[in-house]
Amino acid sequence: MVFDARDGADKLVIALPKGRILKEAMPLIEAAGLSPEPSFDDPDSRQLRFSTSDPRVDIIRVRSFDVATFVAFGAAHIGVAGNDVILEFNYPELYAPLDLGIGACRLSVAEAERFSAEDDPGRWSHIRVATKYPEITRRHFAARGVQAECIKLNGAMELAPALGLCRRIVDLVSSGATLKANGLVEVERILDVTSRLVVNRTAMKVRSREMTAWIERFREACDAVAA
C-alpha cells in the first residue's frame, strides 16, 4: 500500500473511534497537547473532520472498526484502534508501537447458560458461531484443530442463540452484564483487548522524525494520565 496524503498534504491526520473508547482516549489526546475545535463536542454536529489547537494536525472521528482501515490505506497517519480490530484485519501497513491502556475488555466465546454446565470446550470439533470477528475466531479454533463456521453479524450478537441462528457467539465482553441479561455465559476467553496507537508504516518511513516524535508524545501522555 502506498501512502496517499490527499488534500492537506502536510497536515497530520489522527483517526479516533466514536463511542466509549473516544471518551477514554480524549485525556490522552489532551495530554499530548491537542484540543479539537468546539464542534467536536457538539452532539448535534455531523462534522467528521476537525481542526485542532495545533494547525498542523486534524482529527477525524470514525467507527471503531474503521480506524485501522483509514490508517492502513493512508487516509490518516495515526489512529487509536483496539488490538481486536488490528488482529481481525491484519493489515501489513499497520504499525502498533504503543499500548494505550484504555478500552480494556476481552473477546470471548459465550453460549446459553443452560448448556454451559455440561459443555466442554476441549471436546469441540466443529462449532457454529455468530461474531463480528470471523478471522480471529477461525484462526483461534484452527490452532486447536476445531472447524469454526462463522456467521458474520455487526451487532445484536446476543440474540443469535435465542433465535436459533447458532448455539454460540464470539463477542467483546466488559462487565458481562449484557450476556447475563440475555441468558448467556462466557465459556472461553480468546483475547484480552486494549486500544493501541497505530501508525501507517509508509508514513513512518517518509515522515520518520515527525511520526517518532508523536509516538513519544503519546507515550509521555500515557505516563502522565496514569500518574
Swiss-Prot record:
Keywords (A to Z) from UniProt: Amino-acid biosynthesis, ATP-binding, Cytoplasm, Glycosyltransferase, Histidine biosynthesis, Nucleotide-binding, Transferase
Superkingdom of this protein's organism: Bacteria
Full protein name: ATP phosphoribosyltransferase
Assigned protein family: Belongs to the ATP phosphoribosyltransferase family. Short subfamily.
One GO CC term on file: cytoplasm
Assembly behavior: Heteromultimer composed of HisG and HisZ subunits.
Entries under CDD domains matching the protein: PBP2_HisGs
Domain notes: Lacks the C-terminal regulatory region which is replaced by HisZ.
GO molecular function: ATP binding; ATP phosphoribosyltransferase activity
E.C. numbers: 2.4.2.17
